[in-house]
Amino acid sequence: MPKPPFFLSWIDLCGRLPQRRYLDRQDRPRRRYALFFSLLTLVLGFTYLLWLTPLVLQNREIPDFLFLAAEIVSFLLVGLMAVDVWHLRGHRPEGLSPDRQWPVDVFVPCCGEPLEVIKTTLSAVKRIAYQPREVYVLDDGASRQVAILAESLGFHYLSRPEAGLTLQDCKSGNLNFGLQHSRGELILVLDADQVPAPDILQKLVGFFNQDRVAYVQSRQAFFLPKGDPFYNADRVFYETMQLSNDLANAVVSCGSGVVYRRQTLEEMGGFATWNLVEDFTTSYEILSRGWRSIYFPYVLSRGLAPTDLVGVYRQRFQWCLDTMRLFFWDNPLWKRGLTWTQKRHFLIIMLSYLASGLAFPIFYAIPLLVYLRGYSFLQGYELPYGVLRLAYLAATILMFHFLFFQKEPLKQFKMLCSLFPVHALAIATALLHPPGRKPSYRVNNQLPFADQGRWWEVAPHLGFIALHLTLPLISLWQGWALPGLILFNSIFSAGIIWILGDLVLAVLEKPKWSPAMDPRQVYG
């Protein structure tokens, strides 16, 4: 029977947790600090909420209730991370040797991507050092050039339009079309822009020696400009959260660089078609049926990521929309077949979107209301509030530092805060699209080499920044609020400007590329 997280936490702090897994012993110092500050954050956060709640109930105004709700959502997210993310599972970089030569089908779904991108990917697929394998180019774009390219490389070419079929269910429908016309026991899925390493199958196939392993997801990586201004690398997720998910058997399929067992897919009727894209929902359904998932935390393929904010918005909107449709209409708390640990890990992802789209905008707006109204329910309680909130914040920062050690958690936090417009829209869209009413889908990376952004892409951010810069001065000049309250509130305004300013600067600055990472050179 699995031990509860806090029991494991206690025995690890006492130095009595067996160090059996790869890198467990080396990771122990980081893990113990992460545990300590996680527990401290839980205690301080709970104490802060216990102190804050009576003040809000005493005042009974809508903005104050919204502020309390935002604090509770944030605490729930932090709390789940504190409980479930401290222990990671590692794997040896050489992977596992297969006990036999599993027949593998490689699926490369396409839908109108530039020919040079598809050509680079297929040329790399040709160099994959594994047999037996069959490659299927699944072209929903029905491109004659792609067909000629696939045939010249000795690959199978399948196209739903040429077969007289509609493009129903987009990528998931395309993959299911390939599933019907292939027979390999394992299936490697690669997006049209994902350039695989020659040893990708050699390192992943061996994990299927183990019973009930349904899929193995390798770490995602991308060709990125210097500084990665939009944090497309997402090291917090790919280098920490997924390792924690691995330990909990809750690995999220990313839809590319992933190998599936055909038996699993056929058992559930193919790739999931309920959502916009198949990855998250397919893994969610597979795990609820009692199968196992594995995360291989090393880069075995590299692809394109959005280089302008419009592309980032479109991609993150789709991710958030799919996740929140599950939250509203197939919530993990009520999902049969998932363990409580798996439920918590899925809820972390869902709560991060709720915090970004709903809670954070409340934090941005509350100080502005104080400038306008000249009143705060915290008036007269500034000192205890400052002490409790700063202690809670400091513990949270230290917790994130050790949970996501050297993974740029501050950059990830700022990006999550800055994506509030698109996440709020995705949450609302998810509510309006129950089962049977699927949202529309648009393919990403059809124009992958975009450059500098435009100011209107960050209009909401510029609006908040402008208001936080001007309203304190206007409120002081007009006498709307007392100078002490304006000064106290200005601390929050400064923090909000600091958080949102990063994305504004990233959009207005032209990306700089190193030769090895420049997509124009990689993809010709």
What do these predicted ranges mean?
Residues 159-186, 198-276, 287-288, 309-351:
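Long helical/loop segments within the catalytic core of UDP-sugar-dependent glycosyltransferases
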Residues 1-100, 150, 356, 360-363, ...:
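N-terminal membrane-anchoring/stem segments of glycan-assembly enzymes
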Residues 121-132:
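Short, acidic, metal-binding catalytic loop of nucleotide-sugar glycosyltransferases
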Residues 276-282:
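Acidic donor-binding loop at a coil-to-helix junction in glycosyltransferase catalytic cores
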